[in-house]
Amino acid sequence: MGMTRSVAKVLAAMIATAAVPAAAEAAKCGNDAGGFPAWVEAYKDEAAGRGISRATLDKAFANVSYARATIRADRGQKSFKLSLEQFMQKRGGQAIIRRGKSLKKQNAALFERIESRYGVPAGPLLAIWGMETGFGGFLGKEHTISAVATLAYDCRRSEYFTNQLNATMQLVQKGILSTSARGAAHGEIGQTQFLPANVLKYAVDGDGNGRIDLVGSKADALASTANFLRGHGWSAGGGYQPGQGNFGALQGWNAASVYQRAIAIIGAEIDGD
């Protein structure tokens, strides 16, 4: 006797479900280290399905571990809750202004070239550079892939950081990011702290040597930052204080209001020199 259509549909659904790899079922976020190894294996299967080579994935995850320091940092971002005055003091706003003015003079040709191409003046670029890494003095010490993978696994912002991890794998496959790279706690890369997806979208070769190096080349880092701001609506010659047209581009750089206002103030002080 032949099967009815309804029975056939049920059996087909059961077979399809059984065919899903066990790893894919394990690709669920978690809030502690316990499920991280299984999640990594599931993610590798998913990434391979999106075109990342197995060789790249095996190399990228060879030394990845659950980054507890990253989780602590993610849960403890208290400085963004400070008043503007407190934030400026904590982040050394006046010191950034003083050094920024000096660096603007020392690198005048570089900043003129960047402004000519992207329309962004030196002030906000120096403000971001100083605020993010002390002008390249401290880029972070966390293993980048571990940091991004941990945040992708963590339930708090899993979807957002899974997208960042996808971008990270593309950077590794393209040879732009080393599997041993270290940086900030959330996986930010380079002298102005680009998240991996923004590296893919906005990073440029600012020094003309044929490659992109946001860690070792200030020209690449600063030109890429200017390209990011232009990509977020920066208009050449416009103001960038709150209420002015280019302030929205600074909002695109960082979501914290106190950070945005600090960058605007510091940049104006530097540009006013």
Where are each of the predicted segments found?
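Cleaved targeting-peptide boundary
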Residues: 24-33
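Bacterial N-terminal signal peptides that target proteins for export
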Residues: 1-11
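Mature N-terminal segment immediately following signal peptide/propeptide cleavage
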Residues: 32-54, 58
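Catalytic glycan-binding domains that act on GlcNAc-containing polysaccharides
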Residues: 52-273
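C-terminal segment of classical bacterial N-terminal signal peptides
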Residues: 17-25
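Hydrophobic alpha-helical segments
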Residues: 9-10, 23, 44, 112, ...
